[in-house]
């Protein structure tokens, strides 16, 4: 959206500066996200009461009634019209000018004009069957580009509002993805991350015959959510095509469903040297009874098998995950099963969330809601476990050689360092004094000396790669 506005002549300023137009890309994944979205919108109006405040994104989709009644929001745009933001703004501003002119003429003629009412204009929040194409040329980061490959989700986990906010699965045409990544490579980006709402579903909405002809034609299928992931996954097909793009040296993939990892997909991924051995496999719970209530589509044992397959074909891959504690009905025994499972798998990183109700979801009306103090206790236990497992994973690299893509400069303990990540996303630091070139977006090799901080390892450089 920022890119489109700049191309139309708008000047982008930091959010805390006074602006004529404020655009807040809202989130609704949790109640906290809702609240933060509202706070940002209200801050904008307080900063400049005369400014046009625009809400776009998921909160607009799920909270239409609240959005329409919020006096701080002037214009609300649904997810499927983000690509039209610039033209919508221009049309809206033209309408305002016309209304002001009419009001001025009326006042000059001695007629009163009622300006006390507030109306929020809501632009199309209905979901579409097609992917909303928005191609990026550059991103805020200078070394890593995030490439969106699909939108929507068909899973309908019992705690999640995202399918209602983002709609059904819509996959982006492979041709558009390849073109965007090629452009990013030409602009100097060396690493890309494939993102989406549910990227394991990439391509399930494509017409099979069209795909065989090399075309990506999106179609609606009644049984989309029942289609299984297999070794012929369109996601793996896409990875293989991206792998051939010159200039891209690292490919990362976003969150995956465990069942997409089969023997065949694991082998195909391992055959791609550019693919980073860094996999986020969504878990949520290590207890099968809890997983069933969550409407997750796998068992804990199936999850463990997926991890084993990745560890079989990749050398020491980084496995990360999400875990929800305090889901409705989670007993002490069920939580203990999750603790045991997490200890068995051993992750690089875990994102721990305390369950919170989302209006309109099945979980919100389930019986046996877990008290907040219990959630807090369970969360603290898993956070302590996460810290220990993460340290153990990083310790593996001490004394070993590693390759890092330098990204930014930061001062730590009075010393200036260049920071970057390994292929499996371990953060390393090299002293600027030792790095004579002092250039971000440079790949260097070195030996890991030890821990600089709890989360950053210190690298002694051996050579610059390129």
Annotate each language-model stretch with its function.
Residues 1-202, 209, 216, 234, ...:
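Proteins enriched for Cys/Gly/acidic motifs involved in redox and nucleic-acid/cofactor modification
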Residues 85, 279-281, 350, 406, ...:
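OB-fold and OB-like beta-barrel modules that bind single-stranded nucleic acids
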Residues 330, 345-347:
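Contiguous mid-protein beta-loop-alpha structural module that forms a pocket-lining wall or clamp
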Residues 354-368:
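Aromatic/acidic polysaccharide-binding cleft in carbohydrate-active enzymes
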């Amino acid at each position: 959206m920022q890119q489109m506005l700049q191309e139309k002549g708008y000047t982008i300023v930091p959010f805390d500066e006074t602006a004529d137009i404020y655009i807040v890309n809202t989130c609704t994944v949790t109640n906290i996200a809702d609240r933060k979205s509202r706070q940002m919108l209200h801050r904008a109006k307080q900063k400049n009461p005369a400014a046009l405040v625009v809400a776009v994104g998921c909160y607009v989709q799920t909270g239409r009634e609240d959005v329409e009644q919020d006096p701080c929001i002037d214009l609300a745009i649904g997810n499927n019209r983000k690509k039209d933001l610039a033209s919508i703004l221009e049309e809206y501003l033209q309408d305002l000018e016309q209304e002001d002119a009419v009001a001025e003429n009326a006042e000059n003629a001695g007629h009163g004009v009622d300006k006390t009412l507030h109306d929020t204009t809501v632009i199309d929040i209905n979901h579409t069957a097609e992917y909303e194409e928005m191609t990026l040329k550059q991103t805020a980061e200078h070394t890593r580009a995030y490439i969106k490959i699909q939108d929507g989700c068909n899973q309908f986990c019992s705690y999640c509002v995202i399918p209602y906010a983002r709609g059904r699965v819509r996959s982006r045409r492979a041709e558009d993805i390849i073109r965007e990544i090629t452009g990013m490579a030409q602009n100097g980006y060396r690493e890309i991350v494939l993102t989406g709402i549910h990227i394991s579903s990439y391509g399930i909405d494509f017409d099979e015959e069209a795909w065989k002809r090399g075309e990506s034609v999106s179609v609606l299928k009644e049984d989309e959510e029942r289609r299984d992931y297999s070794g012929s996954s369109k996601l793996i097909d896409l990875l293989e095509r991206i792998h051939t793009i010159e200039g891209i040296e690292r490919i990362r993939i976003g969150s995956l469903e465990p069942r997409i990892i089969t023997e065949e997909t694991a082998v195909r991924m391992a055959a791609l040297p550019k693919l980073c051995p860094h996999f986020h496999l969504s878990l949520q719970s290590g207890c099968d009874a809890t997983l069933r209530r969550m409407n997750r589509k796998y068992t804990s044992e199936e999850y463990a098998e997926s991890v084993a397959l990745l560890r079989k074909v990749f050398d020491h891959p980084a496995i990360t995950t999400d875990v929800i504690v305090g889901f409705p009905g989670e007993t002490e025994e069920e939580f203990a099963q999750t603790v045991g499972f997490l200890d068995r798998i051993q992750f690089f990183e875990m994102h721990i969330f305390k369950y919170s109700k989302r209006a309109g979801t099945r979980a919100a009306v389930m019986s046996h809601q877990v008290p907040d103090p219990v959630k807090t206790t369970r969360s603290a236990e898993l956070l302590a476990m996460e810290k220990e497992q993460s340290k153990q994973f990083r310790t593996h690299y001490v004394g070993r050689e590693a390759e890092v893509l330098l990204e930014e400069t930061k001062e730590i303990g009075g010393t200036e360092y260049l920071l970057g990540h390994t292929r499996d996303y371990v953060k390393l630091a090299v002293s600027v004094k030792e790095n004579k070139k002092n250039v971000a977006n440079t790949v260097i090799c070195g030996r890991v000396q030890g821990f600089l901080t709890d989360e950053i390892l210190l690298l002694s450089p051996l050579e610059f790669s390129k």
